[in-house]
Amino acid sequence: MAKKIVGFIKLQIPAGKANPSPPVGPALGQRGLNIMEFCKAFNAQTQGMEPGLPVPVVITAFADKSFTFVMKTPPATVLIKKAAKVDKGSSKPHTDKVGSITRAQAEEIAKTKMPDLTAADLDAAVRTIAGSARSMGITVEGV
């Protein structure tokens, strides 16, 4: 028989930096899950990633206090800001432009995000990434 699911916990944790302090500790402690076990498993799985890159994770909590977790790809906005070498997007995205990325950079971001996007092919994914960049005040050359 399948385990009874008592809830899902969605968090964004920097790669390799999960620790029992907030937001991880309180979120897992509320459900009675082993916080250190999660932190060790998460840090081990994010070892190959760039340290500090925020990684969305969905933790499934079961009635017997066990858990599983699924890691997603880093948010597109973070990858776009990194590619454009800017700290934050524009406060007036359609009038003030803060940076630009090339189509090749947009394709690289789209390849990274492909598992989490609903796009049918790479070209559609690139257009999705370009739309996100435009809404941040970053121009995409060649799209």
UniProtKB/Swiss-Prot annotation:
Top-level division of the source organism's lineage: Bacteria
Annotated PROSITE patterns: RIBOSOMAL_L11
Changes after translation: One or more lysine residues are methylated.
Subunit organization: Part of the ribosomal stalk of the 50S ribosomal subunit. Interacts with L10 and the large rRNA to form the base of the stalk. L10 forms an elongated spine to which L12 dimers bind in a sequential fashion forming a multimeric L10(L12)X complex.
Its job: Forms part of the ribosomal stalk which helps the ribosome interact with GTP-bound translation factors.
Family as reported in the entry's similarity comment: Belongs to the universal ribosomal protein uL11 family.
NCBIfam families in UniProt: L11_bact
Protein name: Large ribosomal subunit protein uL11
